[in-house]
Amino acid sequence: MNLVIVESPAKAKTINKYLGSDYTVLASYGHIRDLPSKNGSVDPENDFKMIWEVDSFSKKYLKEITDSAKDSKKIILATDPDREGEAIAWHVKEFLEEKKLLKDKEVERVVFNEITKKAVTNGIDNPRKIEPHLVDAYMARRALDYLVGFNISPILWTKLPGSKSAGRVQSVALRLLTEREQEIEVFQPKEFWTLNIIFKNNKNEKINTTISQLDGNKVEKFSFKNKQDINDALSKIKNKKYNITDISSKTYNRNPSGPFTTSTLQQTASSKLGFGASRTMQIAQRLYQGIDIEGETVGLITYMRTDGTNISKDAITSFRDFIMQNYGDKYLPEQPLNYSGKKAKNAQEAHEAIRPTEIIRNPEDMKK
C-alpha cells in the first residue's frame, strides 16, 4: 500500500479516483505544526532555532495519517507546488520521522500543476526530493511573522487597547498609508480649466479637438486658471473660421494580455466582476481542486498561486489546435507569444500561469 498525503479533503477525493486501490489518499487539512504563541519559539541568539508544535486541530488527522503510514511501503507527499505546499510536506515528513515511522520506507515528493488524471499520473511517475530552498523561504517568512508580531503587538496593545496584532506585512502597509495620507493633508489644490472644441463636418459628424495653441502661445495644464480665462479664450475663438490642413493616421499594434497570474486574476475579477481577492481565490481553489462533471471529478484550472506567465508545451499545442479548428489560421500567430521573457527568479515564477486544463471545455457546456 502507498500513502499519498495532500493538504485538503477535496483534493484527496479527486486524486483518490485517479490512483486506484493501491493508494490511500489522506488530507493533512493544511499545516500540521506551527510556532506556539509564547516567548522563545524563535531564538535569534541560537541561529534562529524554531520550536514547532502540533496544533489541536491537526491531531485527529495526524492520527489517521500515522496509522496508515505504519502499514504503507511508500509515503508520497503530494501537497501544492508552492512554498506553503513544500512546507506542509516537510512538516509531515519531520513529524513521521520523529514518530520513527519512516524506517525502511520510501518517501517521495510529488507535484503537479493541475489536478487531472494525466498530470497526477505524470507526477507520481516523476517524484523528487523536498526542495530545501522553498522550505527555507517558508521558515524565514514564518520567523519574521513571529518576531514582528510577538515583539510589537504588546506595545501596540498598550498604546491602542483592543486593537489587532501587529504583523510583518500590515505594519509596513500601514506606514505607507500613513505617509500617503500625510501627503494628501498637506496638498494644496490648484484650480485649472480645460477647453475643447467640437466641430461638425459637412456630413454633420462630430470632430472632437483639444486646443493646443492660442494667440501663438502653447496651451498648458494651468493656462486657464479660472472661468474668466475660459470666457476670454472663448471670445477669441468663437468667431474664427477653421480649416483642416492636414490629416495623418497611424496604425497601432497591441498584443493580447498575458496569461493570468494570481495578481492579474484578482485584478480582473475585481474590475470585471466586482469580486474581492478572497472570493476570487475561493472560487479558483474549487476550480483547481475539481468539480463533478458527469460523475467524474475534474480539475478545471491549473494551480492558482503563481507569479509565472509561462505555459506548458502540451497546453500551447492544444490551444493552437483549438484556434486553428475553430477560427482558422487568420487568428493563429506563426509563433506563440512569450510573456515571461526571462528566466524565473524564484519558484513561484517557475510555475505555469493560471489556465484552463482543457481548452475544449467552455462555460456553456459547464452549465449543462
Question: What spans do the regions from the language model cover?
Answer:
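Secondary-structure transition/capping motifs at alpha-helix termini
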Residues: 97-105, 272-277, 290-297, 330
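Short, conserved phosphate-binding/catalytic loop or strand-edge motifs used
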Residues: 113-118, 262-263, 283-305
